[in-house]
Amino acid sequence: MSLRYLRFLTAGESHGKGLTAILEGIPANLPLSEEEINHELRRRQRGYGRGGRMKIEKDTAEILSGVRFGKTLGSPIALFIRNRDWENWKEKMAIEGEPSPSVVPFTRPRPGHADLSGGIKYNQRDLRNILERASARETAARVAVGAVCKKFLSEFGIKIGSFVVSIGQKEVEELKDKSYFANPEKLLSYHEKAEDSELRIPFPEKDEEFKTYIDEVKEKGESLGGVFEVFALNVPPGLGSHIQWDRRIDGRIAQAMMSIQAIKGVEIGLGFEAARRFGSQVHDEIGWSEGKGYFRHSNNLGGTEGGITNGMPIVVRVAMKPIPTLKNPLRSVDIETKEEMKAGKERTDIVAVPAASVVGEAMLAIVLADALLEKLGGDFMEEVKKRFEDYVNHVKSF
């Protein structure tokens, strides 16, 4: 992902020793603890319809560098998440030596996965060399990085949340009226209620109804996708820019969301619905008051105009395709024999939309932390906060 101020990388295979992330650019003197990161990792592991892997992994992050006595140093922050399942995969995922006769190559690519495309690109006859890195297990490292960025944003009053809008063909009917996009209190309430739901639905009383639907789909050997919503509150106007294509904040957010495994669509504000409305029904009228300053009477555009944040809540809906590993595999071809046969199988989830919403929070936090630091600069928190205060005063006086 292209960032302008922050830099981060992740490394690690799904069944390797663990996942590593390095984040550079966070200012010095930000209070940070491992527990704050681990809280986000626990949220990612929740959700009805998850696979057996979640019973094995209890993700915790270890801070290896960049923090001393509970505060960031301004140097790169290195994080490590150990894979507990590694103990069961030492032979299959050995770093050195030759594979033993018991290690069977994965040669039947799964439709919808990176298996075949990646095998061709990197000339790998054992497709496990592709699927291990392509796995959504990698998102645990991104959630850890996002937790640091969330903590940074919280120092400026910026809050990020999410909830599930639909799973498969089953929608949360109450979320079809999108007038709440302009209501920070309603958005935050939905997020808080989703925290009490196994499916991250902002109406936990609907959990059993949705779980029954998931169980019925599972019995058919199918998997499910869905739509989740992620939002940010108290984001100041002026992040991003209209000046060049790659500086537009909505483009940066969309790219970040599309980089999440299995994501196939992103809407900001009304998204595709805006294309079916008249202009007068889409564009958010502007108001001003002594206490609030400039505001919009609605938030159909999801908090951005011209590639720049406008001070309204940032609201993003993200579409996740069904998980491609199926109990009843689809047709494929063995890359060694070229014979048509059923695709290979791996342990997998039935639905992972609730977990993906937490990953979406992390990616939004990374993009906004990067954009805020791009706007303000600064090497230590006290300096950044002073610049933020000056900018807020500028906004109020404009």
From Swiss-Prot:
Gene: aroC
Lineage, broadest ranks: Bacteria, Pseudomonadati, Aquificota, Aquificia, Aquificales
Gene3D superfamilies: Chorismate synthase AroC
Assigned protein family: Belongs to the chorismate synthase family.
Protein name: Chorismate synthase
UniProt remark on cofactor binding: Reduced FMN (FMNH(2)).
Cofactor: FMNH2
Function per UniProt: This reaction introduces a second double bond into the aromatic ring system.
Catalytic activity as recorded in UniProt: 5-O-(1-carboxyvinyl)-3-phosphoshikimate = chorismate + phosphate
